[in-house]
Amino acid sequence: MKLYPTIGLEIHAELLTSSKVFCTCSAEFGGEPNSRCCPVCSGLPGTLPVLNAKAVEYIIKAGYIMNCEISRFTKWDRKNYFYPDLPKAYQISQMPRPVCLGGHVDVTVDGEQKTMRINRIHLEEDAGKLVHDDIERVSLADYNRCGIPLIEIVTEPDFHSAAEVIAFFEKIRLMLQYAGVCDGKLEQGSMRCDVNISLAEKDSDKLGTRTEVKNLNSTKAIQRAIEYEIYRQTELIENGERVVQETLHFNDATGETSSLRSKEDAHDYRYFPDPDIPPIIFTEEELAAIKADIPEMPEQRVARYTGEYGISAADAKVLTDSKRVSDLFENAVKAYNNPKPIGTFIVVELMRRINLGELDLDNMKFTAEDLAKLIELAETGKISKDNRKIILREMLETGKKPETIAEEQQLWIKEDNALLEKTINGIMEANPKAVEQYRSGETKVFGFLMGQCNKALKGAASPASIKAMLEEKLKG
């Protein structure tokens, strides 16, 4: 019997608001435990929530970039359950009237484009965080995260492999970063993914019993959890055992899932309207203004880079696969309007250093303007392209301006014609065979002779000057 996995996702993304969704406490990550709480987010009796308008704006932007229909009327509900990280014993969420309905996002997996449907996106408050101390045998509650605005993106069960899930998750993350809605910092828990998995025969109209793996916050964890759960369910079914509908925890250390609790359905949470938060009716003018404020998305930047700047599609994709890289490129082009060499340098030189861990864009010692100046110095013939790498290395280490480094290390190109002629004569005398080959029509050796001259001159003359004089000398 061939079993076929069907997967649906619930992606939770924290919004980039400065304050929490129903109070004025800071929504910034970190802080001393329980230092960013107030009576509202701590769930004390007699407090009233006040809705953060910026959070509503951000969920509408998220809906638009995912091709959702924005509800003209929306309201909030109480999702009732008890857990130590939820001081009110209910979570303010949305059930029958979410802000966003429907929608889809296209992803490419193994060269094939697939459309993944979205069921809904709703706005809710995050819960707190439990810290378990195995030595003292206690669990500590940190409520700093309580009340941070969160959107939950609920997909249709359109996924059938870990590769499809990861492609979708990464694209959603990138889109939210570009829209300025979520920072996508997985290591800080800004985005988390719950994965619902069931197995059934490929042509069956009926899905199997589903399990939910909770709170996966890295693509590696998502992949391993899906692969293990498919394996576990396959073993159960093939051995004639029953798959239990339950919520699971994924253990990073063992690579296995374990049961947390039975899997709840919506009616188990006893949703009812929150009486303290009035519904919202959006006007067409309000929605149009929010939509007009959405920044350029990655696909739009790729089209502009290839169409206006003449950058290759492959390089344009590299430049836009990270918002930080793309913003660096954008700001450098503003400082020096020569996009193609800037883009090539970022793709070839900076990306290599980023991948090697030599450059962290969040803690860069030089600015986009410094990068632009470095490219300009090389493109205008003031430094050689070899010396450009030397200057970049120093910029990475010290943050000094490229002009300062060029001056300190005497890396400027000095057009000394006497030195240039003497060097070329010496290279030709040292390589008589190559000279003869060139004069006999084997012009390929010109590159070799140019390389020898560049190496000997060490940036003391521009490539154009070297080329012109070398060609003249070789004519005999």
What are these regions (language model features)?
Residues 286-293, 300, 330-335, 371-383:
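Extended, non-catalytic structural segments that build the interaction scaffolds
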Residues 335-336, 342, 350-365, 373-378, ...:
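M16/insulysin-pitrilysin zinc metalloprotease superfamily fold
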